[in-house]
Amino acid sequence: MQIFVKTLTGKTIALEVEPSDTIENVKAKIQDKEGIPPDQQRLIFAGKQLEEGRTLSDYNIQKESTLHLVLRLRGGVMEPTLVALAKKYNWEKKVCRRCYARLPVRATNCRKKACGHCSNLRMKKKLR
């Protein structure tokens, strides 16, 4: 039987499958056609995410049904160099003691009119 897989980009892929095929088999066929690794694929049918150990017939997927393909979000830890850059960008600032405006490190006066461009500045406190 033929089913369709619709991606988030709007592209529709036609697949030739059997009702006894597992979700892993379907993901492998998508990898053959599109080159997307199965571990990054999430298949949705009737608002439910399809689990790997089950078959198409378990979900009552019939001929010409449409599955939706969503890519798994990648997560993880930031590289130490990026963390250092973010800390430098966010922490190395001066703060006006009157209006709490964030200012560059080299500032001598506040840029805001509300505090009268005062020169009462301090370094921003570091987070613990």
Swiss-Prot record:
Glycyl lysine isopeptide (Gly-Lys) (interchain with K-? in acceptor proteins) crosslink location in chain: G76
Ubiquitin-like domain: residues covered: 1-76
Classification via InterPro entries: Ribosomal_eL40_dom, Ribosomal_eL40_sf, Ribosomal_zn-bd, Ubiquitin-like_dom, Ubiquitin-like_domsf, Ubiquitin_CS, Ubiquitin_dom, Ubiquitin_ubiquitin-like
Cross-link (Glycyl lysine isopeptide (Lys-Gly) (interchain with G-Cter in ubiquitin)): K48
GO term, biological process aspect, one: translation
UniProt KW Nucleus keyword: yes
Example of a GO cellular component annotation carried by this entry: ribosome
A Pfam cross-reference name: ubiquitin
Keywords, ordered alphabetically: Cytoplasm, Isopeptide bond, Nucleus, Ribonucleoprotein, Ribosomal protein, Ubl conjugation
GO MF term list: protein tag activity; structural constituent of ribosome; ubiquitin protein ligase binding
Family: In the N-terminal section; belongs to the ubiquitin family.
PANTHER family given in the database record: UBIQUITIN
Name of protein: Ubiquitin-ribosomal protein eL40 fusion protein
